[in-house]
Amino acid sequence: MIDGHGDDAYKYGQKIRINFSSNVYNHVNHNGLREHLYHRMESIRSYPEPEPYTLEGRLAEKHHLPSASVCVTNGATEAIYLIAQTFRGTNTAIFQPTFSEYADACRMHGHRVASMYKLPTAEGNYLLPPDIRMFWLCNPNNPTGAVIEKAYLKELIEHNPQV
């Protein structure tokens, strides 16, 4: 992760009433979680498998997929960096404003990034610039909360086979 994202509340030396720097919500009753974990202490006191192959296999089986099609990560940020690494050097569009890790991961892996501030929507025109081979679209978007309808996403994908 490149500097510029994360929870920096510790820097301010005072209690912050509402912290919007992450999507972790701490103002909730955790009694149900505590009870759930208490009954599973035997299974969680061991160090986990070094790779999530068992979990990936179970997820693949549940969703009728080949196990090679499932990749369990330590969260969205790891997945973003793995995807950017896999498609290193690609012409990439990022719909803005959005989560900063998309651009950071792309810069780290040599992408040529085009920031787009409007989705292509005018009168049924769903085309992205012709040199774009990859695009990042956060849905619902972080930080705006905007939701893009499934029908629009389907049209966007169908009209941009190069991506």
Q: What is each model feature region?
A:
Residues 118-163:
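Active-site phosphate-binding strand-loop segment of PLP-dependent enzymes
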Residues 84-107, 112-114, 125-128:
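Conserved PLP-anchoring active-site segment centered on the Schiff-base-forming lysine
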Residues 35, 61, 81, 85, ...:
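Short, well-ordered alpha-helices that flank and scaffold nucleotide-derived cofactor binding pockets
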Residues 28, 80-81, 102-103, 144-145:
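Glycine/Thr-rich phosphate-binding loops of Rossmann-like dinucleotide-binding domains
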Residues 1-46, 139:
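N-terminal "arm"/small-domain region of PLP-dependent enzymes with the aminotransferase-like
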Residues 48, 60-82:
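Short loop-beta-helix segment that forms the pyridoxal 5′-phosphate
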